[in-house]
Structures are given as C-alpha cells and as structure tokens.
Design a protein with these regions (language model features):
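Hydrophobic h-region of N-terminal signal peptides that target proteins for export
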Residues: 8-17
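Short acidic, glycine/proline-rich loop/turn micro-motifs
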Residues: 66-69, 180-184
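Active-site rim/loop-helix segments in enzyme catalytic domains that contact anionic ligands
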Residues: 18-120, 142, 150
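Flexible, active-site-proximal loop/turn residues at the rims of small-molecule/cofactor binding pockets
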Residues: 42, 131, 175, 273
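Internal alpha/beta domain cores that form substrate/cofactor-binding pockets in large enzymes
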Residues: 55, 92-174, 182
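Short "lid" loop at the C-terminus of a central beta-strand within the Rossmann-like core
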Residues: 61-62, 174-176
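Sec-dependent signal peptide recognition
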Residues: 1-8
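C-terminal accessory domains and tails appended to enzymatic cores
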Residues: 22, 153-158, 163-165, 176-180, ...
Length: 290
C-alpha cells in the first residue's frame, strides 16, 4: 500500500474516532416538505432522544403538491407543517424557496446544499438516490451527490468555510430496481419511536390526509376525527420486509432482536464521501445494537 493511501486511510479513521460524548450532526435532504419525515423520521427521533443534532432540509417549497391549492399560499402552509413536524421530532427544519416540480441540478441549488452541509458541520448526510419516479427526488439525489466532494473544497462557495472532514453520505431506502436495487447497509429499529414518526407525519395535514390520499384514490377513507386520523395513518400498510433488510437488522442488532423488529428505516452508503467501516457506522448511528 502506498504511503499516500495509508495516510488517507489513517486520517479518515482518526476523523471518525469521535469522543463518546461528542454530539453527532446529521443533515437530511428531501425534495419536498415531508420527504425527510417519511424516510428518516424515526431515525431522527432516535438521534434527538440521544441528544444529537438533526436538521431536515426540503429543497423545494412544495408549492405544487396539492389537488386544490397551490402557489405561495400552499408553500406557506407546507412550511408551517414542516416546522411543526420538526418540533414534534425534536429536529431543525428548513424549507428552501425553490419551486416544487421545477427542480434542476443547477449550480445555484448545488451551492445552497453545499452551504447547508458546511453550516451544519455535518457528520452524516442523508438524501434520496438519484433514481426515482419524481424528478425533484432524482435531482435532489444528484445535487447532494454533486456536493459530496465540494464541501471540502475551499474555493467553492468561499463565503462559507469548507469542512475539514468529508461527511458520510447515505441514501434513503426506496423500492426502485433499476439501474440497481437499494442496498440496506444500515437498518435502524424504529419500533420505540414509531408513533413519534406518525405524529410528525400527522403535522403534514395537506399531504398525508389530503394530497397523497387523493393521488391514491383513498380520500374518502380518511377519517374526519383527529384521533381517528392518527390511528388510520399508523395502520397504513407498509412494504413487506425483504430478506436483505432483515439480514441487515440481524447484523446490527443480533439475530434474536433483529428478527423481532416491526418498523425500520434503512440507508445505503453512497460511494461518494467518506467510506465507513462497521465500527464507524456504530459510532455514527449509536442507536444500533452493540
């Protein structure tokens, strides 16, 4: 192994060797104000419960995501919903003012993302994979990928100090198979905070009780009573847990506990950014089993 490669590996390992008392800083990017909550709300609640710092960023303002509302009024409503969801989870929530349905991987938006990662001094960055049915989701994945190296380059966005360590970038779980299926490198047991996640999603009234049921033809099934709505949301069918996801749970929590988990959130390590080993992942995701 050449000296330069050895030095790089030792340097990366040293940067990940965090003091047990040091707080982990996580930033998650979703295309719309509810995407982070859907894909990582439970994991965020666990981080927050342990005293770590989490920020959700919606890259668009959601001003197109409704069947009967739109524009500035809808964007204002969705921003308020996001802030309330963040309050319920114990995380910071920011909504960027880019139009819903019009997101492109431009330099302007890339710089917005680079600055947020730097300002948060992130250890972990979460985002969608760049293959998805929605162009905003795809381009959010591309934009975060494009920021993965640039966050340490001083001459890019020089108004914001560069990071001295590259974060670990991970993808949210999805069900898309092409060009390649999602790989659950990290699987988090969220059973203990499942209702925290549901209550956070409940804050996104315009989405979980109006827009998404309308899209799915289920609007007439949504209860009117707030308590019944919460129960309806919690009882919505989830995707069956596949073999790879169950194996990942058993890897991180042991066979006995891993076999019992009902609700989970999973993440795939991005090939860009820092490449963590198993010990590094346990440091960065301290809720995993020992």
């Amino acid at each position: 192994m050449c000296k330069l490669m050895l030095f790089s590996l030792l340097f990366a390992s040293a940067l990940l060797a965090q003091d047990p008392g040091e707080k982990i800083r996580v930033i998650a990017f979703g295309a719309h104000p509810d995407d982070c909550d859907i894909r990582a709300g439970g994991t965020a609640a666990l981080f927050a419960r342990m005293g770590h710092h989490v920020k959700f960023v919606a890259v668009t303002n959601g001003d197109a995501g409704h069947q009967s509302e739109g524009g500035g009024a809808l964007a204002k409503r969705r921003r308020a919903e996001a802030i309330e969801s963040g309050r319920r989870l114990g995380v910071t929530y920011e909504v960027l003012d880019n139009h819903d349905g019009e997101l492109l991987p431009t330099m302007t938006v890339r710089e917005q993302i680079i600055r947020r990662i730097r300002q948060w001094n992130a250890d972990v960055v979460l985002a969608p994979r760049p293959n998805d049915y929605h162009p905003d989701h795809r381009y959010t994945g591309v934009l975060v990928q494009d920021a993965a190296y640039m966050v340490v380059v001083p001459n890019i966005c020089p108004d914001t100090p560069p990071l001295r360590k590259n974060p670990v970038f991970l993808y949210f779980e999805d069900d898309f198979q092409r060009p390649n299926p999602f790989r659950p490198d990290v699987a988090v047991d969220i059973d203990s905070v499942f209702m925290n996640k549901i209550r956070a999603l409940d804050a996104h009234v315009s989405q979980v009780y109006e827009w998404l049921p309308w899209v799915d033809g289920l609007l007439d099934q949504v209860p009117k009573d707030p308590a019944e709505r919460l129960n309806w949301l919690a009882s919505r069918p989830e995707q069956p847990m596949g073999t790879a996801l169950r194996q990942s749970l058993e890897k991180w929590y042991g066979p006995a506990k891993g076999a019992q988990v009902k609700h989970t959130e999973a993440f795939e390590v991005c090939e860009y950014g820092r490449q963590p080993g198993n010990d590094d992942i346990r440091k960065l995701f301290p809720m995993l089993g020992k």
